[in-house]
């Protein structure tokens, strides 16, 4: 005599949403059961639309991918449908990946969490970062929503050129001294991908200070010295940036000669006006 809705697994191991209710006909007790693929509950397309709501959300906000997972770690929805789609992020081959560890953390802490960049096999081994949020109802985690952050979108922001001159750039560096945004001036050696792949560490006194939590504007030798072995003197402004539990270095730099050339030019204009 009970009626309820539950998420169960079919013979192929896919989650299905099952509705059941009792039904009495001519004094006989029957059971009315309705099943629907769990993924279809979230990915239906409106009439005339080419993309479902989650795909449009993913594209509009600039994420690389959007995942939905059951409380036991099964990824039943992915926008890009890479190798992690329809695998278990707690017990499967990607359990020790950044996303797998994030899912475990979200289930343990029952709150929004982030995973810093690290190589991720389903993305061709390129560095990937994730954010995730549990959906909680009746005191239980019913669903996990996770997004893979787009490196392209981070670079679009960090490589804005207004006010940077010819030799200026802004960039992000993690606690492991790998890039978190790609260098504008040396993308061959210091893109995020090459930084991780070739272990090209972006080290400078300014970056280390920012990672210690300091904020300042100084003149010093920038990170390219780790490759060129030559000092590249810059005017550097740096500050720490919190990303979940991690601290990144946010640095804006411009070549010393270019920065002082601007000052000398301004002084010359002011002198001319004074005459």
Where do the PLM segments sit?
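N-terminal membrane-entry
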Residues: 261-275
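Polar/charged side chains located within well-ordered beta-strands of beta-rich proteins
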Residues: 10, 32-35, 65, 169, ...
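Conserved beta-strands of PAS-like sensory domains
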Residues: 15-46, 123-159, 235-239, 246-262
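Loop/turn elements at helix/coil->beta-strand transitions in domains of secreted/extracellular proteins
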Residues: 29-30, 61-64, 110-113, 248
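Generic detector of intrinsically disordered, low-complexity, polar/charged segments
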Residues: 10, 83, 89, 95-97, ...
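Solvent-exposed, extracytoplasmic
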Residues: 1-3, 38-68, 72, 81-101, ...
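Membrane-proximal, non-catalytic sensory/regulatory domains of signal-transducing membrane proteins
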Residues: 1-25, 67-70, 101-136, 168-171, ...
């Amino acid at each position: 005599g009970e009626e309820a809705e539950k998420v169960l697994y079919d013979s192929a191991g896919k989650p299905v949403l099952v509705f059941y209710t009792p039904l009495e006909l001519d004094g006989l007790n029957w059971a009315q059961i309705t099943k629907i693929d769990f993924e279809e509950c979230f990915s239906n397309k409106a009439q005339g639309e080419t993309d479902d709501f989650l795909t449009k959300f993913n594209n509009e906000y600039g994420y690389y991918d959007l995942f939905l997972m059951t409380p036991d770690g099964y990824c039943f929805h992915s926008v890009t449908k890479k190798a992690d789609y329809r695998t278990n992020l707690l017990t499967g081959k990607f359990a020790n990946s950044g996303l797998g560890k994030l899912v475990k953390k979200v289930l343990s802490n029952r709150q929004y969490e982030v995973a810093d960049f690290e190589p991720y096999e389903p993305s061709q081994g390129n560095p990937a970062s994730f954010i995730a949020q549990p959906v909680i109802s009746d005191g239980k985690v019913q669903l996990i929503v996770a997004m893979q952050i787009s490196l392209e979108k981070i670079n679009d922001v960090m490589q804005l050129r207004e006010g940077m001159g010819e030799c200026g750039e802004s960039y992000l560096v993690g606690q492991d001294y790998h890039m978190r945004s790609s260098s504008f001036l040396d993308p061959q050696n210091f893109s995020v991908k090459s930084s991780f792949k070739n272990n090209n560490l972006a080290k400078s006194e300014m970056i280390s200070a920012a990672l210690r939590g300091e904020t300042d504007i100084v003149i010093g030798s920038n990170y390219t010295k780790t490759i060129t072995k030559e000092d590249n003197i810059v005017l550097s402004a740096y500050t720490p940036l919190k990303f979940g539990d991690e601290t990144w270095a946010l640095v804006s730099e411009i070549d010393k000669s270019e920065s002082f050339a601007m000052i000398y030019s301004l002084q010359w204009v002011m002198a001319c006006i004074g005459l």
